[in-house]
Structures are given as structure tokens and as C-alpha cells.
């Protein structure tokens, strides 16, 4: 009975993780500019991948595998948004413009940064 409950929990976590990954993929295709696409990939993709990794660790029924999966999940959650932020900042400094639908640009452009 306990194994069946674990199997259902793993299946539920995998479905939720797959939905987040699907939302990240849709965001990559549908969003208008580099910055919003990176936001979709880093946020929803991180949650989706992390949930799938967590489900795989739980499915193994081995404490060592589960701890490794959990460590990988924590590492991924800590590093993916930071790397996306740094890539977006580098793209902004390289001159990639935001979409016209974007509301505000809080980073100064190269010319403005040099004047200060």
C-alpha cells in the first residue's frame, strides 16, 4: 500500500513538473523578446526540471539517490536564475532592446552609464 501511494505521489510530481516545463517551452516560443524568454526559461524551467529530478529521487526509494537528487535540485534552483540574470544583463549591455510592450527598463544603457 505504501509503495502505491509513493507511486501516485511520484506521478503527480512528474505531471506538475512536466506542466511547468511545457509552460517554459511555450514561453520561449510566444514571448516577444530575449528578456521575457529568458525569464520563462529560468523560472518555469527551473521549477519543472527540479520537480522531475525530485520525483526521480523519490521513485528510487534509496536514501542516497534521493539526497543526491535533492542536492541537484537545490543547486539548480540556486544557479539557474543567477546565470539567466547575468546573461540578460550582458545582453542588455550588448544592445539587445526590450520589446515595445515592456513597461520599464531599469538598467542604464551604455551611453548613460558612461556619463555618470
UniProtKB/Swiss-Prot annotation:
Disulfide bonds: none annotated. It holds the Pfam family PhaG_MnhG_YufB. It comes from the Bacteria. One of its GO terms (molecular function) is sodium:proton antiporter activity. Belongs to the UPF0091 family. This is UPF0091 protein R00998. It comes from Rhizobium meliloti (strain 1021).
